[in-house]
């Protein structure tokens, strides 16, 4: 015959109370995780959709269109980083920043830094330049001007245009952006694409 809770030992009541508390905590934690997961997925889709499809399609027209757009540059750099060959785009970016220097006194130290990082024989991020261009750039270091890296930058741009840019257009780094449905799909493959897509463009927000 059931005597109700009053008939149970005190230890049983404490155990039941503890179990109820734990279940409540787990349910609350589960709800919180589901909310965060949903929120993160929404954020990733928003990031994917932040660039218009018209703009993304223009990136396939030329490398110049791609890297002149902040989000395009971020996506291309992420692709090169995945191939462990980001030194080319890093050099190109450094040259662009160098040409914006207004103070003549800052040209020489910045030029030497770029040269030592990308062009010298023992450069940590040595770019692939022919011997003539390398020697010409080396001579320019004697009296650095705003145009001292122009030839080297042009050669690296052409190299990226003929090689890595073409591979980028065939990669998921670009295809996931040009096809937004792959970013927000609920399928497992779509969810993976969403994560990858979100990692491409956060810095262009």
UniProtKB/Swiss-Prot annotation:
Post-translational modification: Palmitoylated on Cys-2 and/or Cys-12.
Domain RGS: residue ranges: 62-178
Gene Ontology process terms (BP): negative regulation of signal transduction
InterPro entries: RGS, RGS_RGS4, RGS_sf, RGS_subdom1/3, RGS_subdomain_2
Lipidation positions, renumbered (S-palmitoyl cysteine): 2, 12, 95
A Pfam family matched in the record: RGS
GO MF terms, alphabetically ordered: GTPase activity
Disulfide bonds: none
Keywords of the record: Lipoprotein, Palmitate, Phosphoprotein, Signal transduction inhibitor
Its job: Inhibits signal transduction by increasing the GTPase activity of G protein alpha subunits thereby driving them into their inactive GDP-bound form. Activity on G(z)-alpha is inhibited by phosphorylation of the G-protein. Activity on G(z)-alpha and G(i)-alpha-1 is inhibited by palmitoylation of the G-protein.
Protein's UniProt name: Regulator of G-protein signaling 4
Source species taxonomy: Eukaryota, Metazoa, Chordata, Craniata, Vertebrata
Protein's gene: RGS4
